[in-house]
Amino acid sequence: MVQTVNLKKAFGARVLFQDINIKLDTGKRYGLIGANGAGKTTFLKILSGQEDATEGEVQVQNGKKVGTLSQNQFAYENNTIFDAVLLGNKRLHDAIKEKEELYMSPEFTDEVNNRLAELEIICCEEDPTYEYDVKITRILEDLGFPAASHQDLMSTLTGGNKFKVLLAQVLYPKPDVLFLDEPTNNLDIATIGWLENQLQHHDGTMVVISHDRHFLNAVCTNILDVDFKKIREFSGTYDDWYIASTLIAKQQQTDVSKKQKEKEELEKFIARFSANASKAKQATSRQKQLDKLDVGAIQVSSRRDPSIIFKQKREVGKELLTVKNVSKSYDGNVVLDNINFTVEKGDKIALIGTNGIGKTTLCEILEGNVKADSGEILWGATIQNSYFPQNATDVIEGDITLYDWLRNCDRDADISEIRNCLGRMLFNGQEQEKKVNSCSGGEKHRMMLSKIML
């Protein structure tokens, strides 16, 4: 259904991947995995036509509809929730809206009637059963939007709920080919379960990027691994890929070690007997073997393990945080109502709940970024807290280097300490001098962890 031919993508001298020739079949759901910056999102954008390849081409079977999950939560602020979903089929959306305008015309001329007939044909082609409104209503209700809210503007929704609408937008038309870049971001647990069920029943072709191993195991039939500037396909789930790739790496190590040992033995024989007349013929034979021997090398993977170390600067007491009678409302809508809890030394707490219920609001209040309507936030006297915000990729921006960005976070820190924190998150040497605004989303998340460690 989708095929790449000699695909290559490079940014200047830096090659992300090259010589990519893969075929994505109907009925298969591919998980696209790889290290931060390896080129996953770039490859997905090339597949979906959002970005050009440096070389090669992408071929999509004629007549197949492609759906791509939008990453811009603010693109439909002036649309109703219902219309934002309907825009998943833009041809149908435009025809319906034009029909509505024409029906408001003061006069039904022949020209108007002819155009209405043309629009009716388009609607019939795109929605033969005339059930688009039923389908959209059902999918929105499944995602937690009651029917009464479907005419609300997108601008009234939280970030998490906007993302749910974008999911509905790409899933509602049932495209033959589905491209999803991190679809579980900002979703609550219940919605992730719903999405898993929807994707398991997708009978076309799907490519999804996710860092959620459990999600990949639940929805994928195949794995596409971006590494070594190549994209390799594996059958099975993420766990199947992990087992197979580990075995391949071990086998490669064994093969290289075996050839290296053979090379050393040949070199020793040649050095020992090349000057010996009786052994000269054998030495010459060994030299020919050595010349033909290709030891090769262990391929350098783009995957590297970070070293995340959170060190306390001083000892803390028993009570770290006390929250007393905290309440918060937005436009009359109560989000937090008289919240009370205590965090003690050693606690590890998960904050869960549906989208829009107030989890991020509570975190922002604790951090001091949002003011509560009432109540108290009492931090322990020796506490120094850190915060990883939901919008980390938006917070980390600017035309400055990674080093300068982290330096601005703590002007009192030693130069070596700053470079150490960057190095632990795999930003070494010249990488520390690259611009923040050139970083991928995953790299910005690593930057935020560097800040927290600092």
What does each model-found stretch correspond to?
Residues 1-256, 305, 309-454:
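ABC ATP-binding cassette signature C-motif
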